Amino acid sequence: MKHLKRWWSAGGGLLHLTLLLSLAGLRVDLDLYLLLPPPTLLQDELLFLGGPASSAYALSPFSASGGWGRAGHLHPKGRELDPAAPPEGQLLREVRALGVPFVPRTSVDAWLVHSVAAGSADEAHGLLGAAAASSTGGAGASVDGGSQAVQGGGGDPRAARSGPLDAGEEEKAPAEPTAQVPDAGGCASEENGVLREKHEAVDHSSQHEENEERVSAQKENSLQQNDDDENKIAEKPDWEAEKTTESRNERHLNGTDTSFSLEDLFQLLSSQPENSLEGISLGDIPLPGSISDGMNSSAHYHVNFSQAISQDVNLHEAILLCPNNTFRRDPTARTSQSQEPFLQLNSHTTNPEQTLPGTNLTGFLSPVDNHMRNLTSQDLLYDLDINIFDEINLMSLATEDNFDPIDVSQLFDEPDSDSGLSLDSSHNNTSVIKSNSSHSVCDEGAIGYCTDHESSSHHDLEGAVGGYYPEPSKLCHLDQSDSDFHGDLTFQHVFHNHTYHLQPTAPESTSEPFPWPGKSQKIRSRYLEDTDRNLSRDEQRAKALHIPFSVDEIVGMPVDSFNSMLSRYYLTDLQVSLIRDIRRRGKNKVAAQNCRKRKLDIILNLEDDVCNLQAKKETLKREQAQCNKAINIMKQKLHDLYHDIFSRLRDDQGRPVNPNHYALQCTHDGSILIVPKELVASGHKKETQKGKRK
């Protein structure tokens, strides 16, 4: 037995035997129950290998280290093997597991972690101390229970050290040999869950009470500090008040000022002059809900925010003054600035001495802090009034000179039309040029436009539709003294004056028409000269000689009418010769036109002629094919007749005549002779030669 035991402990023979049996597909259960190790080592091996539920290691008589006396090689603080121990036992377990399905057991531990507020650190330390004391007492009890279980033969000493919260359960449990091993994990998890829920309830209640106390204290401090600051600002001059606000803004950015409220912000903005509002950026505007993390948003701030938006908000300035770098400071600043409304008081319409009407902010601040954290700029801009966009349009025009809000409001009230012309709009002062000057010729044109009136032709005066020419009363000339007026209205040259829909009852323009200069005669003469340029050479000559007939009449008259016309009027020889030349050239021109017309007609009809010829050609081809077919039929019939005749003919000896050697020849008297083909061929050759000679 000792030899066998030493052989097994060496791990040689038993390893070879088990390997061979596992490869052969047999599972042999060796009767080694008489050689069981002490129960402590057996239970320790069962726990290390997965518990008693593992069927692969249920019959192992060896310890985890591979021998009987090697239980001391285990690490004292863990289940892992000692690195100095030999790996024979591990190899034995791996070989023994061959051919056996292994299902791993996965254990998941869930831990509920909750944050403790900064102000309740003392209470949290007290709770942690109590928990530590209870865990210490439980650990001692569990150790005692574990030792009793080991003495009983089957307890797990490490199951008692699984957690400090299992102490009560271990003390109440009886000292069974191995019955408590599978249930230790379940009982411990249940007790851990119950105790954690109790601790969470206590922590939540204490945190809630402490938060309420801190909020009330911070509210009182902020109100007192705001009152002091307001009193100081009211007593100091404007420049000292600006310094105070700047220092407060810097203190807010550095995190030292935690009692800045929205009501104080609006009062400071309303107390500052107009010019100082332009330098305030939205990055310096805080909200009460984003100043301190522990501050509850259920504080009672009352300001009517909708009225402030609809009256004194300039969205355009708010967007332009918002810096980009204010959103890159730190995560807390980013979350706080995302809650800031992109709004600012309008510096053009705000009275510096006027305060905000109303003190109700319940419509803006929600009672829950989570709602304030989720509030974005889109939610704030959702309730904006339409008047904001009207103010934006007005402010875009206010930068220009000679701005009149009443006229601009009337301009925005005009309805638009689909054609792009305001046909229903009323005549207002913002129109650039009145109806009397809508067709004016200005000395100051656009860049690259020729301003010399003498270089412009009559085509420049044509109207937009149908070549309309304006009346002389509608034409005016702007003197050089009005250049200042045009300098003020330079930006208005883009607009058009569509006032031709005015009713007769509409008042006439107060502006008097400019005096008509002497250049109108030049324009008219230039127009006449241009029309003369369009005349032909004959018309110009007839006009120069004062011939009382038009060129068309001279050319188109019949011969009798032309001669009578020349006899009725007293004309000089030069006029008569010119008239005859004009008539001759006109007739030649008409003849040439007729010739060209005939040629064009021929060219146009040539295609039809070609088509007709092609059709005729196809008809002739069809007729030729039919004639050839008829000729071939006649030849075939003649050939058949030859064979029939020669089949009936006989020579002197009574033999049939060969049609290949003889041929039939008709004479002039109608008789038929049988002639050899050689003679017929020679006779044809002689005839052909005679024909060639001729």
Curated annotation (Swiss-Prot):
SMART domains: BRLZ. SUPFAM superfamilies: A DNA-binding domain in eukaryotic transcription factors, Leucine zipper domain. Residues 606-620 are annotated as: Leucine-zipper. Residues 578-641 form the bZIP domain. Residues 580-599 are annotated as: Basic motif. It holds the Pfam family bZIP_Maf. Residues 333-357 have a biased composition (Polar residues). It is found in: Nucleus. GO terms for cellular component: chromatin; nucleus; RNA polymerase II transcription regulator complex. Keywords: Activator, DNA-binding, Nucleus, Transcription, Transcription regulation. Highly expressed in human placenta and also in B-cell and monocyte cell lines. Low expression in heart, brain, lung, skeletal muscle, kidney and pancreas. The keyword Transcription regulation applies. One of its GO terms (molecular function) is DNA-binding transcription factor activity, RNA polymerase II-specific. Residues 193-217, 231-254 have a biased composition (Basic and acidic residues). GO terms for biological process: integrated stress response signaling; regulation of transcription by RNA polymerase II; transcription by RNA polymerase II. Its main location: nucleus. Residues 133-150 have a biased composition (Low complexity). Residues 133-256, 330-357 are annotated as: Disordered. Heterodimer with MAFG, MAFK and other small MAF proteins that binds to the MAF recognition elements (MARE). Activates erythroid-specific, globin gene expression. Belongs to the bZIP family. CNC subfamily. This is Nuclear factor erythroid 2-related factor 3. It comes from Homo sapiens. The gene is NFE2L3.
